[in-house]
């Protein structure tokens, strides 16, 4: 493949990322008009992210067959920071601030593609808007798809975005009502 073609592919990916950021900002703006309460918008962003995450888990596992089965939260954090977040967001992430016996940690995104082209008004943040909650919801959905129930919340602080993740339980497979083993 020639350098020109590779450069055009890289540029098209960058353009689609910028388009996504602008579209996301417009969507959040419309949601703020529709719901009026920024806390309700945060809840809706979380739900949307959760639905995306359940589908991204299948895509991630299909593309990354060499990822080992995670048995603890440190392994989950490692796979999220080294594989999943760079793959889908194109940014690096680190896990830190372990607490509650390794059941709670914070993932820090050094640059958040959702916030590159926007400035969220401080009054909306103080009223309960978590602009990047869709990312936290996607992580929650992806982990639930692989049978880990977690709570996730996002907070944008200047240049970084912090996603607090708290492990709740390992979910058991269950058959639909009326079906036997």
From Swiss-Prot:
Assembly and interaction partners: Homodimer. Part of the multisubunit TRAPP (transport protein particle) complex.
Residue positions of covalent lipid attachment, annotated as S-palmitoyl cysteine: 70
Organism domain of life: Eukaryota
Cell compartment(s), UniProt: Golgi apparatus, cis-Golgi network; Endoplasmic reticulum
TM ranges: none
Keywords on record: Endoplasmic reticulum, ER-Golgi transport, Golgi apparatus, Lipoprotein, Palmitate, Transport
Source organism: Caenorhabditis briggsae
Protein name according to UniProt: Trafficking protein particle complex subunit 3 homolog
Family: Belongs to the TRAPP small subunits family. BET3 subfamily.
GO-annotated cellular components: cis-Golgi network membrane; cytosol; endoplasmic reticulum; TRAPP complex
Cited function: May play a role in vesicular transport from endoplasmic reticulum to Golgi. Required for the systemic spread of the RNAi response.
UniProt xrefs under PANTHER family: TRAFFICKING PROTEIN PARTICLE COMPLEX SUBUNIT 3 (PTHR13048)
GO biological process: cuticle development involved in collagen and cuticulin-based cuticle molting cycle; endoplasmic reticulum to Golgi vesicle-mediated transport; intra-Golgi vesicle-mediated transport; multicellular organism growth; protein secretion
